Structures are given as C-alpha cells and as structure tokens.
C-alpha cells in the first residue's frame, strides 16, 4: 500500500471500536442493590410476628434461609423436609442439585442460630410447626398455599414445589411492602424516607 503500514493494524482503530461498543453497543445494565440485614429485620417485623399467618411466615422464612445460606431461588424451592437437620446451635441444609454442582453430588450448607429476630433456624422451626410438616416427611418445604374460608386459615397445598416465578414474586412483593422499588435505586430512596414508620 504505497509503502505505508496498514492503518487497520494500528491500536487506535481497535481502541475506538472498543469504546464505541462500550458506550452504545451494549444493552444498559440494571444493577440491583443487595438485601441488607436491616431490610431483613424489617421484613421479620412485618411478616414474622407471633400472630402471623402461614403465608407471611413462609415469606419471612424463605427470605431468611436464602440470605443466610446464600441460596438461589431454584435451590430454595427444591428444599425438602428431609434435607433439613436441626442441631443445638445450627441447622444443616442438604442441597441436592445446584447450578454450580457439576457432578450432582450435592452439598451441605450450615446456618447458625442467632439471638436476633432474624434467626433463620428459629423461623424455620416456627414455619414447620405452623405448616404441620413432620420431621420424617419428604415433602417440599415451600409449596403453594391455599386459603380455607371455613377455618379462616392457610394450608399447604399439593406435593409440588413452589414455582420459580411465584417464589420471585413473593420476594418482590415483600420488598415492595417495605417501600423498596422492584427496579433500581429509586426504591432505596423511598425506603429511606419511609424507614421511620417501621
């Protein structure tokens, strides 16, 4: 090319192309804010009171177990009663199938007792008692709930686990009841404004 080097092999066009891809070539990333222990405390106050329903206690228990055990939704909803073992100061969860478990061997997750209102072990015991799930049961822990008009109570229904979409909806509704937006940071500002109510 007339004695000149090829301009396409220069670093400048590669950097320009990469910069263009970074600014306009990719979809906007909607980064979510993490759930904090303070948010969990407010969830427990709202959903985990002594007179709460089975539906509210399920919501609280799902949030606490998934937070304390670093569980994904799929791992949480596939927990069975036989996968839980209570000990004096902790409980162990056996995760049968996980996204990161390449050989499908399963793994155990230990969750410690705390003396706080956000104790996942105590909340799980309360949930199991209220749901009438016996220790020898092999049923899913989190199942759909039906409302009984005659007795004015909630009861677990069926033998199938809670669908992923419903579990996600329960969590988002619980966060929404605290004033948190389901999208990005605008909910955090709203949460800070209404925090004094709880």
Language model feature labels by segment:
Residues 1-198:
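Extended, non-catalytic subsegments within catalytic or DNA/protein-binding/adaptor domains
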């Amino acid at each position: 090319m007339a004695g000149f080097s090829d301009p396409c092999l220069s670093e400048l066009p590669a950097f320009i192309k990469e910069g263009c891809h970074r600014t306009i070539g990719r979809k906007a990333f909607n980064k979510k804010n993490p759930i904090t222990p303070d948010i969990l405390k407010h969830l427990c106050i709202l959903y985990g009171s002594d007179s709460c329903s089975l539906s509210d206690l399920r919501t609280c228990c799902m949030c606490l177990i998934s937070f304390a055990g670093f569980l994904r939704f799929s791992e949480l909803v596939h927990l069975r009663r036989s996968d839980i073992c209570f000990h004096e100061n902790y409980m162990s969860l056996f995760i049968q199938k996980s996204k990161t478990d390449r050989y499908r061997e399963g793994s155990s997750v230990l969750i410690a007792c705390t003396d706080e209102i956000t104790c996942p072990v105590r909340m799980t015991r309360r949930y199991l008692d209220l749901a009438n799930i016996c220790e020898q049961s092999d049923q899913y822990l989190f199942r759909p709930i039906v409302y009984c008009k005659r007795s004015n109570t909630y009861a677990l229904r069926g033998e199938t686990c809670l669908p992923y979409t419903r579990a996600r909806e329960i969590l988002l509704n619980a966060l929404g009841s605290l004033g948190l937006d389901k999208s990005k940071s605008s909910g955090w500002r709203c949460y800070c404004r209404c925090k004094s109510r709880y």
